Amino acid sequence: VNGECTLSELTKELHISVPTITKLVQELVDENIVTDLGKVETPGGRRPNIFGLANSAIYFAGVNVGRDNMRFLITDLQNNILKEENDFTFELLDRPQCIERICSGIENFIAACGIDRGKILGLGVCMTGRVNPDTGRSYKYFTSSEQSLRDLLEERVGIRVLLENDTRARCYAEYTCGKSKDESNVLYLHMGRGVAIGIVVDGQLYYGKSGFAGEFGHIPFFDNEIICSCGKKGCLETEVSGIAIEDKMCHLIQKGVNTILKEKYDQQKTIHIDDIITAAKNDDNLSVSYTHLTLPTNRE
């Protein structure tokens, strides 16, 4: 996926003999995965052929399963995004019906793309919480099934699935094709409804001894009695996270503090972090002051 190159360059890069490389590349050309782009200009001597990936040969699908929405995309071999959907309303619950909702969302999105389903090589699924990509299991959701979540999705959708934690997936994306692509070691801080860290060490995702390195939001940090989603008290996430802001804003509205979010709270009986950010942009005093106090600021 490094772009265009000659057989000689492939031989040096992969440490494979010229006859073997020639045979393998020709097989890929015959399968319409690689394209012969013609001769490359050289100062002298025989001009070699240059080869590149055929964008329409293989596709990759991805889905981010969030706590309250899902995001989908389809890319080609050159990482060009062919189609994406970022506003699929969804509530992540530990119920079988939720798996069905995930699967139907994936299938409907792929169908709407209008591409050959058989050309989708893999489906990357990232989600919040503790995830083991080797076993394909989530240790927070859908734990009652004997089958792993990965196997359940593969069986239902019919495409090879890779399951990964959402923060680690974002970290690896930044490392491979983002602002950190030229770095060997990367530390990625995700602050959304939760707080977590993704780590790349010497070009590899770091999982730690437990396999769950990066659960930064669940470090005991505060002397409070707030129970975190992990079951412990005083985690960083109980005070500094989107969830913490939501909970505290709801509490203030219940106490009668003036805010333009009051009507929405009365309708929904809850407030989402996006609602608070929108209200802050509209100069709602409570939202402005509270997000400023809760969210971290740059300190010297």
Could you say what each language-model-derived stretch is?
Residues E84-N185:
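Glycine-rich phosphate-binding loop and adjoining helix at the ATP-binding site
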Residues D182-E239:
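Glycine-rich phosphate-binding loop of actin/hexokinase-like ATP-binding domains
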Residues R47-L82, H190, V195-V200:
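Gly/Thr-rich phosphate-binding beta-strand-loop-beta motif of the actin/hexokinase/Hsp70
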Residues D36-F60, N165-Y188:
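Conserved phosphate-binding catalytic cores of ATP/NTP-utilizing and phosphoryl-transfer enzymes
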Residues T291-E300:
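Conserved small/polar residues in nucleotide/adenosyl-binding loops
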Residues H218-I271:
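Active-site core segments that coordinate phosphate-bearing ligands/cofactors
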Residues I81, S138, L205-Y206:
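Hydrophobic "anchor" residues
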Residues V1-R47:
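Nucleotide/phosphate-binding catalytic cleft detector across ATP-hydrolyzing
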